[in-house]
Amino acid sequence: MKLRLFTFPNILTLCNLLSGCAAVIFALCINDLEQAFWCVLVAAVFDFLDGFAARLMEVSSPVGKELDSLADMISFGLAPASILYSIYVATGGDELSGFAVFILVAFSALRLAKFNLDERQATEFIGLPKPACAMFFASVGYIMQQNAAAAPPVAAIVASVVFSLLLISPIPMFALKFKHFDFAGNELRYIFLGISLVLLGLYQVRALPFIILAYILVSIVRFLIRRGKSPKISA
């Protein structure tokens, strides 16, 4: 079987990967979390574009699927963990104990393996999507460096554990995927998008962590409401 490596979608995926590598360098070697944020954002754009291009061009291959997973591990696993490590050290944490935040990489790998095998994620995500997790930490790093803000070092470790568990949680998280563009059936998506765009327009990057936390909270509340309404089977 002949494998095509350099298709246009695969080139976009490689751009995603390289953007993630740049984010790691900015976070760990240059200690520039503002540039690291932009690199993660660019990686997320390429991550969207490669899938869009593959569907548009009807180019799908096993190579593309595997390459996408490998790129995501760097851009949305290693890069945010590197940013979190830099935050931990910058706020007074010990360099060696800061290794604990890289639990995020391990759980990102578990999340990827689960996503690749779980067929229930066509219309919604099961657990927190990796790009959302990555953008949360990237934007927090950007804000903290730009405003010279500080936090207890232990907060970085706690955050890494909480978000690691969210990555592999069984909680359905709504996806911004539209089967149609009618408001009926897409109420939550349109309302969330509208509020998010307003907040981004007003507060730019500073709004991102709150938007992502709101996304998580709304998804959890939605899950609990659904579970409360589901019929209980009596013995």
Predicted regions: what is each one?
Residues 21-24, 42, 46, 80, ...:
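Alpha-helical transmembrane segments of polytopic integral membrane proteins
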Residues 1-51, 200, 222, 232-235:
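Topogenic membrane-insertion module of multi-pass membrane proteins
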Residues 22-39, 78-102, 139-156, 201-206:
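Helix-coil boundary and interhelical linker segments in multi-pass alpha-helical membrane proteins
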Residues 2-11, 65-70, 122-129, 175-186:
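Short, amphipathic, aromatic/basic-enriched membrane-interface segments that mark the entry/exit
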Residues 50-61, 107-123, 168-177, 220-227:
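C-terminal ends of transmembrane helices
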Residues 9-15, 56-113:
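Multi-pass membrane catalytic core of lipid/isoprenoid biosynthesis enzymes
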Residues 126-235:
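C-terminal membrane-associated helical module and adjoining short loops/tails
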Residues 12-15, 36-43, 100-107, 133, ...:
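Hydrophobic alpha-helical transmembrane segments of polytopic
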